């Protein structure tokens, strides 16, 4: 078993857009921008031996505001730009009651099962309480990228940006060998 780093998509690897004063996930390809340091930070994690998995809630799919082909193209671009190992998506809304929608840990458990990941040797990096709580539910070390909208006090660490989150991960030790 090996450790992994689970990265939230919006607000961590992808810039959120502001609509009506709220930070939201981009719904159009022309609004989809990968943060400047995403590729270099994923590379640092890979060099340290970590598998990098994106896990993201995308309820706009269920609401009919984001088409599956557009989401697929966004994720193709993200994979190409950052070389993440896997992207897991929950397309449901809260009322669906699925096990994959954060803060429930279903996506983390699925990734762990498929790739033989030890969740206790893994990290979650997110910008909202849902990300942190999903990680904590399965024993991951949870790092919050603190944003004005984050509203979370339960993270194991709080940092201003992705580079700082990766610094925390690497300071805690490299991933165990495969």
Model-inferred region functions:
Residues 7-9, 56, 126-127:
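Active-site flanking residues adjacent to catalytic metal/cofactor-binding acidic residues
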Residues 27-35, 64-68, 101, 155:
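Flexible, glycine- and charge-enriched loops at secondary-structure boundaries
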Residues 10, 59, 104:
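Anionic group-transfer/hydrolysis microenvironments
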Residues 38-75, 84-96, 135:
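Substrate-recognition element of Asp-dependent hydrolases with the DxDx(T/V) motif
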Residues 3, 68-86, 95-124, 128-178:
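Asp-based, Mg2+/Mn2+-dependent phosphohydrolase catalytic module
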Residues 15-17, 91, 146:
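Residue-level signal for short segments within beta-strands and strand-turn junctions
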Residues 14-16, 21, 63, 133, ...:
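Conserved protein kinase catalytic core
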Residues 1-51:
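Active-site neighborhood of HAD-like aspartate-dependent phosphohydrolases
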């Amino acid at each position: 078993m090996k450790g992994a780093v689970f990265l939230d998509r919006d607000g961590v690897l992808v810039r959120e857009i502001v609509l009506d004063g709220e930070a939201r996930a981009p719904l159009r390809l022309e609004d989809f921008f990968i943060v400047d340091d995403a590729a270099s930070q994923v590379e640092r994690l890979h060099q340290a031996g970590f598998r990098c998995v994106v896990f993201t809630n995308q309820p706009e799919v269920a609401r009919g505001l984001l088409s599956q082909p557009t989401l697929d193209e966004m994720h193709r671009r993200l994979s190409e730009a950052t070389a993440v190992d896997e992207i897991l998506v929950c397309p449901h809304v809260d009322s669906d009651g699925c096990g994959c929608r954060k803060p429930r840990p279903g996506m983390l458990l699925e990734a762990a099962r498929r790739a033989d990941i030890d969740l206790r040797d893994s990290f979650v990096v997110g910008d909202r309480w849902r990300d942190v709580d999903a990680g904590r539910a399965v024993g991951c070390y949870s790092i919050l990228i603190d944003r004005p909208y984050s509203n979370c006090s339960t993270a194991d660490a709080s940092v201003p940006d992705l580079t700082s989150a990766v610094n925390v991960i690497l300071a805690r030790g490299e991933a165990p060998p495969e």
